[in-house]
Amino acid sequence: GRGIIAALEKLKEKGAYEMYRPDVVIYDVLGDVVCGGFSMPMRGGYADQVFVLTSGENMAIHAAANIAMAVDNFKNRGYAKLGGIILNRRNVKHEEEKVRELCEDIHSRIIGDLPRSETVTDAEELAMTVLEAWPDSEMAGEYRKLAGQILAVCRKQGENNA
């Protein structure tokens, strides 16, 4: 937990947010670590929205449910809200059905649906992102579409808070 906050404080100290003026900052935390490390960006005021990426695998669904419950507990303290679920397909049986059921249980929705793609693993082998390796690929388009969906949710939340 302390390492995450130290990194965020260093970015702030260096003026990274003012210099780059990002629309969105993404913090990637392990789903099985719903503890201080997960909550620090929210408690420190570094997060307004939380988007949970999950597949339809049972352990991923379980971790996503735990994260959603933690976010729900924090929202009453004025911390971040759950922006939605992103389905990162692994092509397991009944995957979409399981994730939709999760969404019903946590009162959320799927805001993005990433297909399983060998393009991702091929890019990883090159130590690159898909957008770096193949910016015109179908998968790069999927990531751009997801970025637009995340921005739409964030902008709507911003309008509701104005």
Which functions belong to the PLM regions below?
Residues R2-G3:
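Glycine-rich oxoanion-binding loops at beta->alpha junctions
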Residues A6, K10-V24, V29-D113, D122:
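Conserved catalytic-core segment of NTP-binding enzymes
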Residues R116:
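Active-site donor-binding loop signature of nucleotide-sugar glycosyltransferases
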Residues T119:
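Conserved Rossmann-fold dehydrogenase catalytic segment
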Residues L126-S137:
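C-terminal boundary of histidine-terminating zinc-finger modules
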Residues P135-L146:
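Short, hydrophobic-biased amphipathic alpha-helical segments
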Residues A147-G158:
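Short, hydrophobic alpha-helical segments
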